[in-house]
Amino acid sequence: MAKKEHVSETPATAMLKANGVPFTEHPYEYLEHGGAQHSAEVLGLDPFTVVKTLVMEDEKGRPLLVLMHGNRTVSTKNLARQIGAKSVQPCKPEVANRHSGYLVGGTSPFATRKEMPVYVEESILALPRIVLNGGRRGYLVGIDPQVVVQLLGAKPVQCALAE
């Protein structure tokens, strides 16, 4: 029997454990610029269920997190309209790191450095289970999607565009 690969705890998994949230671990070989498509492929998962955590900011530089399907992009115009902002754009990697405390490619919505509003593509909440970043490059965790609403107060939005 293959030995289960152990991954050391991250702030994200510590938060999940502290809140009694059951999760599965999915370590994989990280590929620079591989994104959610790569991790889905390597782990044999549907990219629609692999959720990426995107650090964005509004026109005033206020940070926010967007949870999006791995095979979709964010319509920043639709997102801005739904959250009452003039505009929204992705943060530069160093700014995203400053806000979240995580490296790009390893950003989890859990236990971020700064508390930020979290928005989740509405269709994600209808899935039975999702896989998202566990706080380290090459490390995903599987959870019930309702956890993002319960723990983070994530608000549903409709801003997905097919890639």
Spell out what each predicted region is.
Residues 1-163:
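Extended, low-hydrophobicity, polar/charged segments
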